Amino acid sequence: MFLLTAEDKSVRTSKKIFETYHFAYDNPCIREVLEGVRPDVTVFMGAYDTGFLWGKGSSTASAYTSGLFQLLMNETAGNVGRFLYLSSEEVFGGEYTQDISCEENCAAYTVRAQAIAAGEELCRSYFNMGYETIVLRLDHLYGEPLTGAEARDICARMSVEGLETGEIRVNPHNRVALLHYSDAVEFLYAVITAKKMTYGVYQISSGETISVRSAAEFVAAELEGVKVVEDTGRERMEPVLSNQRFAEEFGIRIVHKPETEIGR
């Protein structure tokens, strides 16, 4: 396993990583790295890449899309293998009354979400040209963040809100399908080892919705003095991604449940 990161050399690495390369994704050295490593599968962290500082807005979005474009050009020019692009439910910012299919058009409203959606389109264009560039949308990924930059999921946001205000305010009618890191890794492994991919876009979801209030209560139970407050005007409905396409091709088995994992 090799790691390519735009973060500086202080970034933590795992013992399972053979070698780490610290380059921006549009660095001319990338082609040389890819030619030397020749990966069978490349996983672009996309929506979960902590190397991008989204507080800088449009400049970060430009760096994100240009870096992805350069990486894809070098990958496909060298024909080095499958390319997986990790996206999220964040590209759907509208209101939805039913599960969202893989073919639904993105409705991204924030700069970050628009950049992630633009990355999806770029990967799909390469897929349509015959390359194995696969978009994987992960639905409400959650788990224990190791850094502040990773604390972006709905449970982490609830924890921060509770610690800062003593309350977690939720819409009692809102529901969400939570996908634990560990389950997501198993599903990603199935994609990495698959002999052939049928489609250019897949959605990975637990397929099991719970009320946002229940999730908030699981979080509040681990935070002393924090209460859950209902507020019907507070937030939009969370999108729920249909996992039908992925389930038909790879199967879905959820091991880690929110009621036992949140707050661990």
Predicted regions and their residues:
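Short-chain dehydrogenase/reductase
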Residues: 61-62, 104, 108-120, 149-156, ...
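Short, polar loop motifs at secondary-structure junctions
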Residues: 5-11
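C-terminal substrate-binding subdomain of Rossmann-fold SDR/epimerase-dehydratase oxidoreductases
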Residues: 171-264
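NAD(P)H-binding glycine-rich loop region in Rossmannoid oxidoreductase-like domains
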Residues: 23-63
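NAD(P)-dependent short-chain dehydrogenase/reductase
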Residues: 124-176, 181
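Conserved catalytic-core motifs of eukaryotic protein kinase domains, centered on the activation segment
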Residues: 14, 52-59, 94-98, 147-148
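Conserved active-site helix of classical SDR/Rossmann-fold NAD(P)-dependent CH-OH oxidoreductases
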Residues: 68-69, 113-124, 156-159, 186
